[in-house]
UniProtKB/Swiss-Prot annotation:
Transmembrane feature ranges: none
Cellular compartments per GO CC: nucleus
Protein name: Helix-loop-helix protein lin-22
This protein's encoding gene: lin-22
Pfam families hit by this protein: HLH
GO molecular function: DNA-binding transcription factor activity, RNA polymerase II-specific; protein dimerization activity; RNA polymerase II cis-regulatory region sequence-specific DNA binding
């Protein structure tokens, strides 16, 4: 490995990587990093100014550490005002919901549907009860085997008894 003095045209040959370029780029990278930090701090300062509503004389005296401390306090206030359902530490490790929780999660969206269907279900149940009452009333009032409905040939008695009753009805006429 040959070593040269670092100048604009001289390069140390070490696998095609220039040590001189790395050394020269380091201050430039540091300058860019500091510029990003200062830009972010000024943005934080503007956010805090809008939130704090303090006069501009005090704003110019804020140090970088003050800005960071106030930003942390501000974020903590926001977090306490609006608690998250899952904290970052528990979001990756989640336990499966219990059956009661699953049922609760299912019931909540079904409540509007149930309130919509409830009157219709009540009407349907009332209709079924009326139909049963009507059928029982007909059976109670017609024990002799008279057809339950005019359009149906169904009788309450055996077919032999029904035939016998038909013959008796014809003889009366």
């Amino acid at each position: 490995m040959t070593s040269f003095l670092c100048s604009d045209t001289e390069i140390e040959s070490d696998g095609g990587i220039s040590r001189c370029k790395k050394i020269k780029n380091k201050p430039l990278m540091e300058k860019k990093r500091r510029a990003r930090i200062n830009k972010s701090l000024s943005q934080l300062k503007q956010i805090l100014i809008q939130d704090e509503h303090k006069n501009s004389i005090q704003h110019s005296k804020w140090e970088k550490a003050d800005i960071l401390e106030m930003a942390v306090e501000y974020l903590q206030q926001l977090r306490s005002a609006q608690p998250c359902s899952l904290s970052p530490s528990t979001s990756s490790i989640s336990t499966p919901p219990t059956p009661k929780e699953e049922i609760r999660n299912i019931k909540v969206p079904l409540n509007p549907i149930a309130s919509f269907l409830n009157p219709m279900m009540q009407q349907y149940v009332a209709y079924q009860q009326l139909a049963q009452l009507s059928m029982y009333t007909q059976l109670f009032n017609n024990p002799a085997g008279v057809p339950l409905r005019a359009d149906a040939g169904v009788t309450a008695q055996s077919p032999e008894l029904a035939e016998k009753l038909k013959i008796e009805d014809r003889s009366r006429v």
